[in-house]
Amino acid sequence: MNVSFAPLFLVTLILLGVVSNNNSITISATILLLMQQTALIQFVPLVEKHGLNLGIILLTIGVLSPLVSGKAQVPPVAEFLNFKMISAVFIGIFVAWLAGRGVPLMGQQPVLITGLLIGTVIGVAFMGGIPVGPLIAAGILSFVVGKG
């Protein structure tokens, strides 16, 4: 008997999202549960293939939108030479590199995704994190278990 625990897992995520007042988990898990339980299941492979990229695009739009609205200004070149700005640039490079290591690891060892997701959910639900953690977590994990 082949039983899928995905619906139970999604309901658990929905409950965790409600209890922790985390709309991103609640909405995401609800949409996936509705897709899984209806004819929308046919679009799950499309979400699986393109969802991460679309999510990163939306996140980037959200981060850049204050520049467009005028709420944030592009700093003058001279400000790029202070310690905080230089640190921000190097940390941004490092985190992007970590995420770049994480994506191949998730593809090569997909069983690790479950652990990364559980850790991310706990971090989002109970520690005030945001669900961008799996990529960075996979990048850090690549140092522990080896890349690929």
From Swiss-Prot:
Stored Pfam families: DUF441
Entry superkingdom: Bacteria
Keyword Calcium: no
Membrane-protein topology: Multi-pass membrane protein
Keywords, alphabetical: Cell membrane, Membrane, Transmembrane, Transmembrane helix
GO cellular component: plasma membrane
Main location: membrane
Ranges annotated as spanning the membrane: 13-35, 50-70, 80-100, 121-141
Subcellular location(s) of the protein: Cell membrane
Family: Belongs to the UPF0756 family.
HAMAP family: UPF0756 (MF_01874)
UniProt name for this protein: UPF0756 membrane protein NMCC_1816
Lineage: Bacteria, Pseudomonadati, Pseudomonadota, Betaproteobacteria, Neisseriales
